[in-house]
């Protein structure tokens, strides 16, 4: 990918070289250095396509004129920059070229040549449901939907009970930054679970082709114990079945050795 440099940056660099290479005044005992600087800054808003370009012109460490793409024209920062700002704003070609540098410089350098449609990194969320307290059925409780490690920040999390959206008793934390550009959020639902009810956390995010749905089913302790016992029994059954087949296979092979003498005649 070729790095694009705003055209006015090259002009500023030429000015710097001309100023620094100017001959020393004859008869002077010391040199005076004048430095003109140009800074091009691109600002990217997380999770959006919005890009802002700011170009700053600096003379001897003092900014004197600036272009801000949100403003759309040059503005003098000091009186020194007023003539330049007025002149550049009066030249349609200069303004058009500078405005285009939001795409030709900022967007180009961020996206690269392989894509022109996606400015943002996408990370799919991980979703899990937990119960805040271990309580029996028919007692007030809180379900917590943990949505973690997603980017960008825009996300929609909803709760459903038996297929119907729940809006009462729903609360959420603020978005939490993980420090690696990804986010996490907790969305809580206050409820009183009853036997057989199904609660669903429904998550929509730009990284997903279809929403993520995670279910939690209200079960009594006895039903949960029976289910776990059944799962454990199935696992043990598979283990013993495999062991029995292995032993049978080994026993069918029999000892290896030469055939009986009668078969050799």
UniProtKB/Swiss-Prot annotation:
The keyword Transmembrane applies. It is a single-pass type I membrane protein. Disulfide bonds join 42-106, 145-201. Residues 28-226 are extracellular. The keyword Lipoprotein does not apply. The chain crosses the membrane at residues 227-247. InterPro entries: Ig-like_dom, Ig-like_dom_sf, Ig-like_fold, Ig/MHC_CS, Ig_C1-set, MHC/Immunoglobulin, MHC_I/II-like_Ag-recog, MHC_II_a/b_N. Pfam families: C1-set (PF07654), MHC_II_beta (PF00969). Residues 217-226 are annotated as: Connecting peptide. Residues 1-27 form the signal peptide. It is found in: Membrane. Keywords: Adaptive immunity, Disulfide bond, Glycoprotein, Immunity, Membrane, MHC II, Signal, Transmembrane, Transmembrane helix, Ubl conjugation. Residues 125-213 form the Ig-like C1-type domain. Glycans are attached at residue 46. Ubiquitinated in immature dendritic cells leading to down-regulation of MHC class II. One of its GO terms (molecular function) is peptide antigen binding. Residues 248-265 are cytoplasmic. PROSITE patterns: IG_LIKE (PS50835), IG_MHC (PS00290). Belongs to the MHC class II family. This is H-2 class II histocompatibility antigen, A-D beta chain.
